[in-house]
Amino acid sequence: MSDKAAFERGTDGPKVIVAGLDGSESSWRAAAYAAGLARRQRALLAIVYVQPVLAAGAAFGAPVAEATAEIADELKAEIEKAASRFQSVSSLRWEFHTFTGDPFSGLSQASDELKADAVVVGASEKAGHRIVGSVAVRLVKAGRWPVTVVP
């Protein structure tokens, strides 16, 4: 009975790792952790920023779409700057994606569309999430991907 597939060293890890990034300190730590994991597993790192549908600036007449697009551009520029510093020592494959919606729905959509094998997010820094539930808790409860929460 040699029909069983033989174990191949280095081929059983995740192929796509999604990291949620919103600019908070914990999300940057999560992205760094995910980058290390992706590098070691030779996986694709998909960094995802979810643009909010409504922002506080909308109440004051600020152009919300332009503001959130600007945030996405700034995050991407910071990521590219960090990646260029390590390019000579690492062959990390990464992509930057933006999705629109609330963070849970956006990360869920991204993880589904990108066929994520794992999702990495930062721990919530907002006090209200103790009552409503953080994005990380909601992703875990969805039970569709392994989720790592980085403090």
Describe these PLM feature segments.
Residues 118-142:
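Glycine-rich, Arg-bearing micro-motifs that act as flexible, cationic patches
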Residues 62-66, 113-115, 137-138:
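Short, hinge-like loop/turn segments at secondary-structure boundaries
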Residues 6-61, 142:
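Small/aliphatic-rich secondary-structure junction motif
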Residues 49, 122-124, 151:
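Short secondary-structure boundary segments
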Residues 64-77:
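A short acidic, glycine-rich active-site loop
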Residues 142-151:
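Short, acidic/small-residue loops that bind anionic groups at enzyme active sites
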Residues 48, 95-99, 148:
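General small-molecule cofactor/ligand-binding pocket signal
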Residues 1-12, 84-119, 126:
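Structural beta-alpha unit
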